[in-house]
Amino acid sequence: MEMLEEHRCFEGWQQRWRHDSSTLNCPMTFSIFLPPPRDHTPPPVLYWLSGLTCNDENFTTKAGAQRVAAELGIVLVMPDTSPRGEKVANDDGYDLGQGAGFYLNATQPPWATHYRMYDYLRDELPALVQSQFNVSDRCAISGHSMGGHGALIMALKNPGKYTSVSAFAPIVNPCSVPWGIKAFSTYLGEDKNAWLEWDSCALMYASNAQDAIPTLIDQGDNDQFLADQLQPAVLAEAARQKAWPMTLRIQPGYDHSYYFIASFIEDHLRFHAQYLLK
């Protein structure tokens, strides 16, 4: 591992690291915020997954999460949104290829060689964080848009791994919206049954009651993608039918930007703290 940056921040440290990923077959960067130590108890971790076109720095520089994370004693880990590099398959569109990994394991050439973000987030990155930093094994997950999709599927596919999950303007039903259809047909092929494994609504309907964890979703009602790409009411209905403890908050006037995230990130951190710090 190589440290790329380090900055003092709210008595803690904001760092950026590069490491060689055996899962993704390329070098990867991630950002991490380490809160000031409180006692000898290792702090819990909140993983943040960003959206289309982003990397590990968008949340770090725009969300303003460090102040409350420092107060609460929560480590923040921000991975990149895809594998990257000259040898990594790419596409000219903003919503496919590098910067748009969709947090799944691709099965189609040429994507399958590198695009295994699900395995990276489930196994390799948490193991690396555990081995290199003084953190506890208690963790939660959150994300925005494509990253909200990622956070939800990570939680739904891994019962017991996370104490809680939250999302801002997530893509909840990718099998049925243009962003998801484009990505899934490219990364996974045309068999739509294979897509269901990566769709939060399908996973919610297939979930078991004993695996449910507290879930918070915020959605701006002035989001230009709300009707065509996001459709959170579809997941809310699935959660209702499964008696899954999910709160969906529609926030008047807010759009899809980091101004929206910055406005409510404190709520999300305090939501996760209730369960992370038990």
UniProtKB/Swiss-Prot annotation:
This entry's Enzyme Commission designation comes to: 3.1.2.12
Gene Ontology molecular-function annotations: carboxylic ester hydrolase activity; S-formylglutathione hydrolase activity
Catalyses:
S-formylglutathione + H2O = formate + glutathione + H(+)
GO cellular component terms given for this protein: cytosol
Could you list this entry's UniProt keywords, alphabetically sorted. Hydrolase, Serine esterase
Q: Which GO terms describe its biological process?
A: formaldehyde catabolic process
Cross-referenced InterPro entries: AB_hydrolase_fold, Esterase-like, S-formylglutathione_hydrol
Which branch of life, at top level?
Bacteria
Q: Which residues form the active site?
A: S145 (charge relay system), D223 (charge relay system), H256 (charge relay system)
Protein family (similarity comment): Belongs to the esterase D family.
PANTHER family hit by this protein? S-FORMYLGLUTATHIONE HYDROLASE, S-FORMYLGLUTATHIONE HYDROLASE YEIG
Q: What does this protein do?
A: Serine hydrolase involved in the detoxification of formaldehyde. Hydrolyzes S-formylglutathione to glutathione and formate.
What name does this protein carry?
A: S-formylglutathione hydrolase YeiG
Organism encoding this protein: Shigella sonnei (strain Ss046)
Q: Which gene encodes it?
A: yeiG
